[in-house]
Amino acid sequence: MSTPDPPLGGTPRPGPSPGPGPSPGAMLGPSPGPSPGSAHSMMGPSPGPPSAGHPMPTQGPGGYPQDNMHQMHKPMESMHEKGMPDDPRYNQMKGMGMRSGAHTGMGPPPSPMDQHSQGYPSPLGGSEHASSPVPASGPSSGPQMSSGPGGAPLDGSDPQALGQQNRGPTPFNQNQLHQLRAQIMAYKMLARGQPLPDHLQMAVQGKRPMPGMQQQMPTLPPPSVSATGPGPGPGPGPGPGPGPAPPNYSRPHGMGGPNMPPPGPSGVPPGMPGQPPGGPPKPWPEGPMANAAAPTSTPQKLIPPQPTGRPSPAPPAVPPAASPVMPPQTQSPGQPAQPAPLVPLHQKQSRITPIQKPRGLDPVEILQEREYRLQARIVHRIQELENLPGSLAGDLRTKATIELKALRLLNFQRQLRQEVVVCMRRDTALETALNAKAYKRSKRQSLREARITEKLEKQQKIEQERKRRQKHQEYLNSILQHAKDFREYHRSVTGKLQKLTKAVATYHANTEREQKKENERIEKERMRRLMAEDEEGYRKLIDQKKDKRLAYLLQQTDEYVANLTELVRQHKAAQVAKEKKKKKKKKKAENAEGQTPAIGPDGEPLDETSQMSDLPVKVIHVESGKILTGTDAPKAGQLEAWLEMNPGYEVAPRSDSEESGSEEEEEEEEEEQPQPAQPPTLPVEEKKKIPDPDSDDVSEVDARHIIENAKQDVDDEYGVSQALARGLQSYYAVAHAVTERVDKQSALMVNGVLKQYQIKGLEWLVSLYNNNLNGILADEMGLGKTIQTIALITYLMEHKRINGPFLIIVPLSTLSNWAYEFDKWAPSVVKVSYKGSPAARRAFVPQLRSGKFNVLLTTYEYIIKDKHILAKIRWKYMIVDEGHRMKNHHCKLTQVLNTHYVAPRRLLLTGTPLQNKLPELWALLNFLLPTIFKSCSTFEQWFNAPFAMTGEKVDLNEEETILIIRRLHKVLRPFLLRRLKKEVEAQLPEKVEYVIKCDMSALQRVLYRHMQAKGVLLTDGSEKDKKGKGGTKTLMNTIMQLRKICNHPYMFQHIEESFSEHLGFTGGIVQGLDLYRASGKFELLDRILPKLRATNHKVLLFCQMTSLMTIMEDYFAYRGFKYLRLDGTTKAEDRGMLLKTFNEPGSEYFIFLLSTRAGGLGLNLQSADTVIIFDSDWNPHQDLQAQDRAHRIGQQNEVRVLRLCTVNSVEEKILAAAKYKLNVDQKVIQAGMFDQKSSSHERRAFLQAILEHEEQDEEEDEVPDDETVNQMIARHEEEFDLFMRMDLDRRREEARNPKRKPRLMEEDELPSWIIKDDAEVERLTCEEEEEKMFGRGSRHRKEVDYSDSLTEKQWLKAIEEGTLEEIEEEVRQKKSSRKRKRDSEAGSSTPTTSTRSRDKDEESKKQKKRGRPPAEKLSPNPPNLTKKMKKIVDAVIKYKDSSGRQLSEVFIQLPSRKELPEYYELIRKPVDFKKIKERIRNHKYRSLNDLEKDVMLLCQNAQTFNLEGSLIYEDSIVLQSVFTSVRQKIEKEDDSEGEESEEEEEGEEEGSESESRSVKVKIKLGRKEKAQDRLKGGRRRPSRGSRAKPVVSDDDSDEEQEEDRSGSGSEED
């Protein structure tokens, strides 16, 4: 059989392994020495014999089958247990067991327990190289004790043998006894670790050395003791064949190798062939012991055991005595198995070396020679394997490579094994030292005794352990019991305390709960009465509670209301006094004239051309008392003719409702003035009488009934009974003392009927007029404030004979809408729309002066601009639309209206809820009623800090806050009327708002991610001449850029241009599908708009940015949608036409594109029923205004508001902030938060929180599908089904298109320059920052001479003679010629050097071309012109208004780009007064017109950036007019001064004056001549005084410095 492959890449063995197991030498290659598996193989030859700690004898003669041996052991054990050891059968079986048990290969290897019981060391703790063996109690633990029949008998003179013969007959013959004794002695010597003498070895084997054998011994090597050493030759090594095994060494059990299988019956592992008979035995070179044992060892014939799996070579002839079945014939049936009679040898025997020992070979030399040969073969083999040809087959090459690597690992394996052996030896020595008796015993015990002893010892240990554990357990139990008793005692004590504590706490909790319930009940009752305005009950509860703070608040409220009531009374009394004086004057004028024609209410005579002439005049028949009114009554213009034709009629006296009192009442009141004031209730009751026109007498019962009804109608503050019980009038009743019922609208209002709540609003407005008060109509947007205002005007014209003029101030965007409403509702009212160019406005002046108009509509701007025209008219009523623009008391509009315009009656219209700033609210009330609301600080103190004076904490609880708000409401209620849609207009269709989340396209996502993380926008690199390579662009105001990206990425022009080139479009504009594929919002619109058009729903689309509207127009053109557009650039005259076109019933335009700011105010677009807010505004009221363009009176359909919001973007934060603002505004006022101050740190933190991307819930981030969107926009089921079919058709059509693309752009469609990772973007950003930091290159600076060319004496002389310019020019020429001379001298002296320097100059010029090109040279302006400019600019800057505030303060210097980046994005040409002054100094302006352009540009920039009506906006308008007037004034002064100066100069030339005076005159003459020369076009050199010396400062820009130098250079030419 072939040898198995060597493990671990070792070289193949030349022959089979001779031992019972694979040789470990196979892993290291063949070795001539001892087996590497042994403990001594790595350490060289051992100085002594191998340790006999674990003897493993070789094959003996008695080889029995394993099964027979197991069957024999059972009766032996049973006989031993029955006490039958003397039975001859027992001794016979025991002898057979001893002979067979000497062979370890008779069965499977013993278990660890068997090893322990038989003296073998345990594999876990035993050592292979113990110095003393473990005593064995069985026959298998000793060396082989059986011998063949040819064994030599022991010496007859042995006393032990004699003793045994004397004891009686023995079953052994003499030779057997000698052999047995020799074996016992050898066993004892081996047990003590002593060497065996040669004669003892021969006696143990039962043989005598014969002469023939002794001669052959040197030639035959001794048999191998271990199966681990392979033969050195190519032949098969010695196996377990015939030949004696030396008893001085046996391989320990289990040392065959880590992977060696257990030995078979013959000691050979499975698969390993045994040695054929007759093979040469292998010598064992083991030091001197091997030399000693070699001549005495003789081959022993052994019978191999029966093979278990396969046949083995035939053994030699076996004597009958060695048969495995039959006992030896020479033996008696009983065999000596008891070793008891043998006395062990206690004395150490000396080592005996026989004399006849032959001279053998030196094993060390043989070992060295073998090692040399092996090393040479290994080296040769490695060379062969390294030089193998490359044409070998793959499997052969693999085997050769494995063999080469194995040979190279040989030394490493040797070192590793040596280290392992060293470690094992060290450990073994330590264990042996600690337990010296582990491997020896002095007394041999039988197996039974050992077992009994072991059993008793085990029982004793178990008992001791049990007692110890029991004692310890009792100790622990006592401790635990004590701890348990201790805890139990304290637990009972603690439980009693807890019960007591719980009982006390329960008592107090119940008491507190009951008290809390009672307090809550009282507080709820108090709040209920407070909300129900039951002040008497509320005060009683406050008295019961004895809450000082609430009582103090109520006391303060009473004081404030009492003060305001007194102020209202004073105001009304003052107005009545004014009316009396006015009427007295009229009466006197009438008496003086004697007979007066019919006059109007304003004292002017009526004629046929006036508007009043068309109104009917009420007349009464003197005798019958019949009154003619309405159509039966004569017209005012035809009154005199009608009275002549109808005698007996006269003009009926005016009632109290139309006139504050008759002349008789006035006289009575005048007489009553010196008398003490009557109780407040009586005059009010008299005033409240409204007599019926048909009957002058009214009963007292009716009068009282009317009074009570009027009180119940208007007094919503307190009940009538409570007011009468206190004997006081309520604040509201005092304010609206005079009441008048209004049941229907004026006859002048046509084409519509007012709704009931609008009639109530008209009644409230008329009540304000009757009580000489002004107020705020603050109905919610869409409830018809414009219509109610027109109703008031027509009512006053018809019933009060107030013909006007009425001044209505409106925003420019709503002026056309007002005109449209007037034309529709009151066409008979003469109105003037005062707007347009200056020439157009001047055309209205004659009509305004004649007074032939009723209403003048104008804007805030023209009120300020044309106040010199409009303020001359005495207005009867001033009405301001969008009145919240007046919230700033210091704004220009408020100041102009208060100071220049005369209008006793004022009305504010606003649909926006009142803001949370008290000064703004006070500003509105102060504008309306300056005599009542005088001081802002007092007003703010009333409501802002009620406890500031008491020293208590200012924080207010909910109840106190409600009291403060009610206090404010109580103050506002007489002057403010506000109704909500849900309260007054039940039939108005509902408005449903949906927020639709839109996904981003891949382009949007990439741009958004980098803008959010780094604040940079990706570009294609074209701005840096790196087109296609990519780049970045840092932009300010990151939030604005993120909003642009969310709307549409093409709002960045370079992105669209790069993409158009990438997609193949020309002109830099993207068209077609890619317009909506680039934006998620546009893609949603592309799905929604076709459905809305198919179902005839008109759409209002509101955007924040006009550039986005332009992109949307391209999309509408691509889809073929008809649309209209209105933004801030739309002219006022065009707006009305756009509204009319869109609102027409059959209009083809179904989309109206509006900007939120320009188109969200005052427009009436109720023909649309769908509002799409493309992007939300920071101010939520702007979006509400936009929604109410459609959701207003007249709307017949349900209104759907769709607010688009990009998912996971900054728009979600803006929407959340807007909702928060709306929630705050619902309270109207929050106590303690009126100032609304926030630090810059808080604002930055808020913006940072918006920029941070937070993870949202998946449900919130879910983009709705088509079905969800259809549910949002569908009004009923039929529309929903239609929309679903349209979606299905669209998807089918897209599927049929072979070139179809996804609805939104994906990343694989993007160009390479936009797909950058974060590291690349960081690199590009750093490059851009470095370029900004270091610049693009150096710039050549010119040399500047700051020294004076003339001395002071020379300069004075030149001034006197007038030759200053000539002298300076000469000096300049001298310097230049001197410089040229130096250059020419240097050039002539070194021509080569000059050539080099010229080359260098040329190179430097080429290098400097990267800088800014030289500026255009400017010649200085005339001094007179510069002086004029400075004078005008200084006058404009120093202008102050009436309050002493300098208007130009914010215009002097603009904020930097970092502070206000939005300004520089919106304003293309920023300019301020500082820059204007610099340009004047640098002679940039050639005339006053150039200066005027920049000043007007400055004002226009302010008006563009700021909201209309803001303070800066108004100041810019004033500064424009100031500049114009100052310029005209200076030009006039200049003309007059020119004439006077000519006269003065003539007189000065004739007279003789001082020298200094003559010098000044000459200077003036020189300036005059120069100015005239310039006007004629001639050129003169400027004088010294007019020459602008270049000055370099840090503030000047490089460009201006170069212009200065170039300007000075032009003087040299």
UniProtKB/Swiss-Prot annotation:
Biased composition, class Polar residues, residue ranges: 162-177
| GO MF assignments | ATP binding; ATP hydrolysis activity; ATP-dependent activity, acting on DNA; ATP-dependent chromatin remodeler activity; chromatin binding; DNA binding; DNA polymerase binding; helicase activity
- The EC number(s) given in the record are 3.6.4.-
Which enzyme type, at the first EC level?
hydrolase
Which controlled-vocabulary keywords does the entry list?
Acetylation, Activator, Bromodomain, Chromatin regulator, Hydrolase, Isopeptide bond, Neurogenesis, Nucleus, Phosphoprotein, Repressor, RNA-binding, Transcription, Transcription regulation, Ubl conjugation
- Which BP terms from GO are recorded? aorta development; aortic smooth muscle cell differentiation; blastocyst growth; blastocyst hatching; blood vessel development; cell morphogenesis; chromatin remodeling; coronary vasculature development
**Places the protein is found:** Nucleus
Q: Name one GO cellular component term.
A: nucleoplasm
Source organism (scientific name): Rattus norvegicus
Q: Which gene encodes it?
A: Smarca4
Record's compositionally biased regions (Pro residues)? 1-23, 231-249, 259-286, 302-327
* UniProt name for this protein: SWI/SNF-related matrix-associated actin-dependent regulator of chromatin subfamily A member 4
Basic residues bias spans: 579-588, 1577-1587
Tell me the lineage of the source organism. Answer: Eukaryota, Metazoa, Chordata, Craniata, Vertebrata
